[in-house]
């Protein structure tokens, strides 16, 4: 487990891009952290590091946003998904099986189920307006 402190959104994005280089196809990145913590900013960095060029946005209303690239990324918001059937219907396991990196916000809603996938855990805590404490477990940067 490693802990990082970022002092700006740009630093959070850069840390995500750095982590992307350490991810294998089909990796699951399980995020925890409150509203506005920086999960989407970190995911923007993942997308950049994976070579995805489309702008990254929060999947809150879409449930999943898919970004094409040399190493594709599926960005899920699990907040409004309530059952494993809903998770399957949204294509969660299909994306993993196809080799996409899957970034899952609000992963604590399915902690036991996602644990079976051997996730890389990223916890982002809001320290102050610009500072974030980011704990990464399951991959070495």
Map each language-model feature to its residues.
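P-loop (Walker A) phosphate-binding loop of NTP-binding proteins
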Residues: 32-34
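N-terminal pre-Walker A segment at the start of P-loop NTPase domains
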Residues: 1-18
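Phosphate-binding P-loop
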Residues: 20-26
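Conserved lysine of the Walker
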Residues: 39
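Short beta-strand-centered segment that lines the nucleotide-binding/catalytic pocket of NTP-utilizing
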Residues: 52-67
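Short hydrophobic/aromatic beta-strand immediately N-terminal to the Walker A/P-loop
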Residues: 28-30
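Short phosphate-coordinating micro-motif centered on Lys-Gly-acidic
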Residues: 2-3, 48, 82-87, 93-141
């Amino acid at each position: 487990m490693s802990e990082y402190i970022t002092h700006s959104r740009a630093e959070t994005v850069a840390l995500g891009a750095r982590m992307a280089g350490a991810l294998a196809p089909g990796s699951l990145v399980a995020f925890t952290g409150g509203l506005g913590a920086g999960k989407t900013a970190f995911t923007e960095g993942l997308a950049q590091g994976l070579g995805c060029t489309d702008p990254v946005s929060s999947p809150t209303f879409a449930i999943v946003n898919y970004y094409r690239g040399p190493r594709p990324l599926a960005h899920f918001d699990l907040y409004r998904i309530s059952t494993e059937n809903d998770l399957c219907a949204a294509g969660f396991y299909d994306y993993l099986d196809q080799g996409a990196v899957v970034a899952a916000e609000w992963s604590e809603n399915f902690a036991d189920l996602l644990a079976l996938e051997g996730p890389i855990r990223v916890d982002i805590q809001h320290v102050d307006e610009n500072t974030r404490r980011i704990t990464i477990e399951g991959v070495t940067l």
